């Protein structure tokens, strides 16, 4: 495959054109008066969104050099989304500003390596200032504010704050599409897994078609039970106690299942059987989680335990268990609190060590089931198009909220960046080109406020000047068109999002400035295949 090569200024300008095309498409969404972008889809209705990373991911440019520039800035948005879950538009905007200001200086003959040094120095100082000015999230009200600003909707803010309050910081909040027009919150208390009863004859409430067991014993095993003789000794002990039983096993079939059903129908004793959740190694870990939560043991040949030798003290217990056709929910397991805390710590360490996003997600689900709970935000809307747009906004707001809980909040609307300029201005260096790098960041830090103002139809320079000359904490509320104390008014951003956006933008932009040569593949021009000749329409053989 033949390659095309560009050098120096020509290569940087070609890539900058791509950066500008992507950033200009993304930055129209910034701020409370930001607009939406419509993305064409090959199948179905177009997607309308104001989510920076979703827009960036859709952009592929025809010109190969421009596309390389666009892909570099796309990485800024993607990385910020991965780390903080929000702030992708701000990150893209900052990258564009640093590249634009940096290229002016490189074109004028400045050394890009020294400029890069100045950029790093200024970014480190700004990040330190952002961390210093952050305030810990304090209660439900702060959480609602963060979510409302991210989603540009106070209702969504309240919904997410309710969810966080109910499941705690360790809980899992998922976002699903609803079949109705309303957006609702559904909270599952206790540990729930997606396995239901093995026979409908096991239900205790025929109207709701579910089984509810109060203070039951819980037998956990990774074995398949098909012979009733294996569990007969423990069943006799439970009948004598007058208790109910939940069996969680790999499977229960044949004679064993039939005997349990017959005894339930006769009223001898109540037993509900469900399959163990998960598969393979994950199933073993989930059974162990349930055992720790309920204070029981997993009966497994791996640890030398046989079903026929089970005693009552090996069984778990819980305040209540609800089993439907699809799900089992264990409420208030009677396990030892210290052992549960140790298990939670172990899972948390595994989350930190794993690099797989899928494994991380599954571990977080297990952590939530042990430590908090699970909340589901069911997103409703009148049309499919509105539903997708609303779902994306709620996912962003949720990510912003989690980031705020981790590292606290700072004044929103780009105010935190303007406040960081004061510290950056104090920096100095003997080398003039390093000072240029510092000046580039000083100018780039104004860009978010400038763009928020532009999207509101206002002149950014005037607003920036007014904020700089105001006391600390004062910023510009673009929605109301007034200067106000951002923290007091609840216009806040997560410190983690603000920090990550700047760090990722500077990382990619400073690398961009040191580019001297671009190598791209020349696309093949395949000639259209010649049309096949039309066959004769002979009438041979006809009389």
UniProtKB/Swiss-Prot annotation:
One GO biological process from the UniProt record? protein refolding
Q: Report the main location listed first in the record.
A: cytoplasm
Please indicate which superkingdom the organism of origin belongs to. Bacteria
Which residues are involved in binding ATP? 29-32, 86-90, 413, 477-479, 493
Q: Which reaction does it catalyse?
A: ATP + H2O + a folded polypeptide = ADP + phosphate + an unfolded polypeptide
Q: What is its EC number?
A: 5.6.1.7
* UniProt-listed InterPro entries: Chaperonin_Cpn60_CS (IPR018370), Cpn60/GroEL (IPR001844), Cpn60/GroEL/TCP-1 (IPR002423), GroEL-like_apical_dom_sf (IPR027409), GROEL-like_equatorial_sf (IPR027413), TCP-1-like_intermed_sf (IPR027410)
Q: Where in the cell is it found?
A: Cytoplasm
Could you name the Gene Ontology cellular component terms for this entry? cytoplasm
Q: What EC class does the entry list?
A: isomerase
User: What is a GO molecular function of this protein?
Assistant: ATP-dependent protein folding chaperone
State the UniProt keywords alphabetically: ATP-binding, Chaperone, Cytoplasm, Isomerase, Nucleotide-binding
What family is this? Belongs to the chaperonin (HSP60) family.
Question: Subunit notes for this chain?
Answer: Forms a cylinder of 14 subunits composed of two heptameric rings stacked back-to-back. Interacts with the co-chaperonin GroES.
The entry's function note states: Together with its co-chaperonin GroES, plays an essential role in assisting protein folding. The GroEL-GroES system forms a nano-cage that allows encapsulation of the non-native substrate proteins and provides a physical environment optimized to promote and accelerate protein folding.
State the name under which the record lists this protein.
Answer: Chaperonin GroEL
> Taxonomic classification, please?
Bacteria, Bacillati, Bacillota, Clostridia, Eubacteriales
